[in-house]
Amino acid sequence: MSTNDEVFAKDNEFWKTYLRGRAQPPESFFERIFRYHEDHGGHFGTVHDCGAGNGPYSQKLRSRFKHVIVSDVAPGNVELAKERLGNDGFSFRVARVEDFDDIPTGSVDLVFATNVMHWVEPSRGAKAIVSQLKSGGTFIAAGFGPARFEDQKVQDIWTRISQSGGRRLIMKADDPTKILKVAVRSSRYYDVAPTDTSLFVPGTQRIHLNMNNGGLTDIVYPEDYVAAAEPSYTGPQDDEIFESEDGWSFETDLEGVKDHFATFPFSKEDPEVFAELWAELEKYVADGRPIRGCWPAKIILATRV
């Protein structure tokens, strides 16, 4: 992996696999966001879908907003989004979440950042979001990447696969320290996105869904997590909420787990490293038992002052 941008540049086949192998958020996910936005006096003019990939959620945002800005760091992803979504109510830009000079100050009603904020340096990301949001606008960040399996043996093997893959991704990065921080942010309780009360209304909601048995599966070993851990971005006035919610569970088989694996950047790194772990999992589920689990999800909802 020579640059971070290469991690994000994906072709159409990858996005087909991504839709098979990742959570498809239930309607309640979007209803929660729209309800929060409406309850806090937000308008439904412009929404910025940042770090959008090929825009899998952009059409849902368009169902409520007049204009959707779809942006991603990878030009190929933006082209795929443009081909699929068209220009009716959509505009497109190639940019990082941190890049905001071309977005007029205070012009966006809602910033939607799903499965991307762990890649963003927290203070720079906050500056970009604050600049573009209108007063009373909504910032929503969410993370629902790694699955969590009901069977503890399956979960144990999956954790070892994830940690092994994460370490190799870090070792091959141009900037291993930066990628280690990304991996730490994307694990456990997805502690991202500072919302300083001088910039956001006190009471940011940090909602943990389906985390009774743990948060997002770690993609770093415990010793690496401790070494790279950042200060918590959960403020003293934030509202931490823990809930169970229907619509995030799944039942799959070994091929389904492999589809999930294929959605992670480390899936193409040294495949022989994972051979023994896959053999262990294949032997364990050889009797045809279904593999059940859920998608833990973190949702952060904040209102600009």
UniProtKB/Swiss-Prot annotation:
<dbReference type="GO" id="GO:0008757">
    <property type="term" value="F:S-adenosylmethionine-dependent methyltransferase activity"/>
</dbReference>
<comment type="function">
    <text>Methyltransferase; part of the gene cluster that mediates the biosynthesis of pestheic acid, a diphenyl ether which is a biosynthetic precursor of the unique chloropupukeananes. The biosynthesis initiates from condensation of acetate and malonate units catalyzed by the non-reducing PKS ptaA. As the ptaA protein is TE/CLC domain-deficient, hydrolysis and Claisen cyclization of the polyketide could be catalyzed by ptaB containing a beta-lactamase domain.</text>
</comment>
<protein>
    <recommendedName>
        <fullName>Methyltransferase ptaH</fullName>
        <ecNumber>2.1.1.-</ecNumber>
    </recommendedName>
</protein>
<dbReference type="InterPro" id="IPR029063">
    <property type="entry name" value="SAM-dependent_MTases_sf"/>
</dbReference>
<dbReference type="GO" id="GO:0032259">
    <property type="term" value="P:methylation"/>
</dbReference>
<dbReference type="InterPro" id="IPR051052">
    <property type="entry name" value="Diverse_substrate_MTase"/>
</dbReference>
<comment type="pathway">
    <text>Secondary metabolite biosynthesis.</text>
</comment>
<comment type="similarity">
    <text>Belongs to the methyltransferase superfamily.</text>
</comment>
<dbReference type="Pfam" id="PF08241">
    <property type="entry name" value="Methyltransf_11"/>
</dbReference>
<keyword id="KW-0949">S-adenosyl-L-methionine</keyword>
<feature type="region of interest" description="Methyltransferase domain">
    <location>
        <begin position="49"/>
        <end position="140"/>
    </location>
</feature>
<keyword id="KW-0808">Transferase</keyword>
<dbReference type="InterPro" id="IPR013216">
    <property type="entry name" value="Methyltransf_11"/>
</dbReference>
<keyword id="KW-0489">Methyltransferase</keyword>
